[in-house]
């Protein structure tokens, strides 16, 4: 009795305190860390990342790429040979080679510093904007990219990865 009680008290009370303290550290903070921050990280930022930036990337820049540059390409570039836009340097359509909008074929197929390489609209090799381009048209620094004609297939620096 005399020896048992004083020994039991110092052992029991600190253990009870330790258990309560552990529950405080592992229960409430974990709830805060897993509930509120996740709500912030998964709700508001995703809304911002998927709503406003996509609106900017898909609306305004595309409008700029389709409106102003096309206006420049339709007005200013020199025609080297053939019909409208089939130029060697600075051509806008058809068969442009360097610094032009197209290399051969239809609208927007270009080689160097151009909009696209072979085929239809926006398949670029260097500096292209859409389609199945290699550099600047899906591989490096492009908005759309490699292979499929669907929206947002880029590899490096594109709006979408694949």
From Swiss-Prot:
It comes from Tenebrio molitor (Yellow mealworm beetle). GO terms for molecular function: structural constituent of chitin-based larval cuticle. The keyword Repeat applies. It comes from the Eukaryota. The lineage of its organism: Eukaryota, Metazoa, Ecdysozoa, Arthropoda, Hexapoda. Component of the larval cuticle. Keywords: Cuticle, Repeat. The tetrapeptide (A-A-P-[AV]) repeats found throughout the protein are also present in many proteins constituting the protective envelope of other species. Sequence repeats lie at residues 27-30, 43-46, 59-62, 75-78. This is Larval cuticle protein F1.
